[in-house]
Amino acid sequence: RRGYYGKIGDRTVIKNSRIIKDTWIGSDAYIKGANKLKNLTINSEPGAKSQIGEGCELVNGIIGYGCRLFYGVKAVRFVMGANSQLKYGARLINSYLGDNSTISCCEVLNSLIFPAHEQHHNNSFLCAATVLGQSNMAAGATIGSNHNSRGADGEIVAGRGFWPGLCVSLKHNSKFAS
């Protein structure tokens, strides 16, 4: 039933937040200045405290243990693995963000992002990506730029329907559907 389910764990701190509805929050979480938290599970515990900061709007998602979300990020229909971060206006929509990943200043839609992903420039993918199926990549994206290796190590695997935007740069070797 809508508007009925919610839980706040032990030692959780919530300050200056506008809307919190149908949200389960684990212990030791820290939430300050969030605009909207709706229909969420925020996993948090003493050894892996999750934090949500100023201006965040999060709807229909699961946030893993030890995650940090700050500075006006927006996420809708999403899952974040443990110890992941969204920062500086990033948008995560209809996507899964793997463990130990960081996304800043950019938009990720309809994506399966594997663990240890770092995306910290506008419209850039700086690590290996698996993009399968009917997929689209933002204009100006850069795939693989010596951040995880200097050798050709299969930076991108793209399946049927892969559609890169204008000025996309694919560095190192790549595998595409035939």
Functional labels for PLM-detected ranges:
Residues 1-134, 138-140, 144-161, 166-169, ...:
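Domain-scale signature associated with acetyltransferase and cell-envelope carbohydrate enzymes
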